[in-house]
Amino acid sequence: MAVEIEQFMCRSDNFGVLVHDPKSGQTAIIDAPEEAPILAAIKRTGWTPTMILTTHHHMDHVEANLALKERFKLRIVGPEAEKAKIPGIDETVEEGSVLHLGDERIEVIATPGHTAGHVSYHLPASKVAFTADTLFALGCGRLFECKPPVMYESLRKLAALPAATTIYCGHEYTLANARFALTVDPTNSALKERATRIEALRVDNKPTLPTTIGEELSTNPFLRWHDPAIRKHLGMEKAGDAEVFAEIRKRKDNF
């Protein structure tokens, strides 16, 4: 039986997520951006959280850790490399670590780039992954603590997940990402169609997430370093994949 997922907005543009295993009754919170919206989601669903799965140390992902831990006596899991920066952490994980939500297997993927210790959580049986600020819909996270080749390798890992994998990200950045994507991949018809859909969703204040690996592979320039049209547009036909990624990231930083 697949997990049930409740996605909701926190702060100005963060996504909060609850992941519930109906068989065991266990519930995980993916990051804790803000207490009040998380409590509202818990009340709305009737699910009692048993753990927080932290992806990285930035305050807009851990702010409610201690308040939720005190209220629900839950355990907080997070990356070993950032344990000193994550409030209330009880258990650390790294590449290859395995957790369980009831019988649901959670595989930890090290995805540094945005921060040096960032991790993503993959639930293969439910075909879902939580990538926070590594992979966004039509984008990737800004590189605060790592160089472009590090993020490139992290995105390669995520791109290798099955195309049908549903992806939940950390922020509602998709509209701005779409506008940038069109500047580096202007002839991509799938991207143009997706950008139109995104514009309509945001006019109605509707979320653009979740997405899928397959959709990102066809439209997200940060996963399309190999594409001949993008390479030609950038004048980088003979460059290495990591170089193309770095140029796209540089352009996004200045967009």
Swiss-Prot record:
It comes from the Bacteria. Gene3D superfamilies: Ribonuclease Z/Hydroxyacylglutathione hydrolase-like (3.60.15.10). One of its GO terms (molecular function) is metal ion binding. Zn(2+) 2 binds at D60, H61, D133, H171. Coiled coil: none annotated. Pathway: Secondary metabolite metabolism; methylglyoxal degradation; (R)-lactate from methylglyoxal: step 2/2. SMART domains: Lactamase_B (SM00849). Zn(2+) 1 binds at H56, H58, H114, D133. Keywords: Hydrolase, Metal-binding, Zinc. Monomer. Thiolesterase that catalyzes the hydrolysis of S-D-lactoyl-glutathione to form glutathione and D-lactic acid. The lineage of its organism: Bacteria, Pseudomonadati, Pseudomonadota, Alphaproteobacteria, Hyphomicrobiales. Binds 2 Zn(2+) ions per subunit. GO terms for biological process: methylglyoxal catabolic process to D-lactate via S-lactoyl-glutathione. It is an enzyme of class 3 (hydrolase). The keyword Iron-sulfur does not apply. Its cofactor is Zn(2+). It catalyses: an S-(2-hydroxyacyl)glutathione + H2O = a 2-hydroxy carboxylate + glutathione + H(+). InterPro entries: Clx_II_MBL, Glyoxalase_II_hydrolase, HAGH_C, Hydroxyacylglutathione_Hdrlase, Metallo-B-lactamas, RibonucZ/Hydroxyglut_hydro. Its EC number is 3.1.2.6. Belongs to the metallo-beta-lactamase superfamily. Glyoxalase II family. NCBIfam families: GSH_gloB. This is Hydroxyacylglutathione hydrolase.
